[in-house]
């Protein structure tokens, strides 16, 4: 699996995301600029756009035209005016104020089983404050909380229609989540597995069958038939 992380600047999140993703030995991760991404996108199974701005315009055009899956990570350096003009799935009206937002888990989330569950124990992320809207079918995994006040808007949202899947993580500072997860559990395994499940959700072939039935096509009347079935979640995990 080939994942390309696209960023116009440096941030400790980039290395933390790469380390989390390559904990799966079947995953290869490349970190590139928006301009470099134009030569990498064709062979990418997943594109991760980190704090996109207008330099991402040609790449975003390809994603939109080809209805590609995408993971969007936004924060204080994200140009939401640009994003709001280019697409309408995720929109945000910022007010020019940056603050810390803490994650609050939403129990109804059922797209896949998150290996990490201790969301309340993680440090806050940083982002520009503003109302987020998701247009179309989606599920939110995390809601935002500011100074103990839970807001009716997501930190992490999963959008899916018949042609594509997008994920939004609104907030930077994943590197602090990964460090705290290790401090709490003595291992990166659970938090890395969650990042891996998110990437898998975005990179699976939607033509795959989620219900696999194993049976013999023809049975003799006197012989009992045995049918075995396996059901996979949307990340194609048992």
Label each PLM-derived region with a short phrase:
Residues 4-6, 167:
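Conserved beta-strand elements of the Class I
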Residues 7-11:
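Short, surface-exposed ligand-recognition loops at beta-strand->loop->(often short) alpha-helix junctions
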Residues 12-206:
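Acidic, S/T/G-rich, low-cysteine, solvent-exposed domains in lumenal/extracellular/periplasmic regions
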Residues 147-149, 234-238:
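Detector for glycine-centered tight turns/loop "hinges" at secondary-structure junctions
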Residues 207-214:
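Proline-enriched interdomain boundary motifs that mark the N-terminal boundary
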Residues 214-220:
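Short beta-strand segments of immunoglobulin-like
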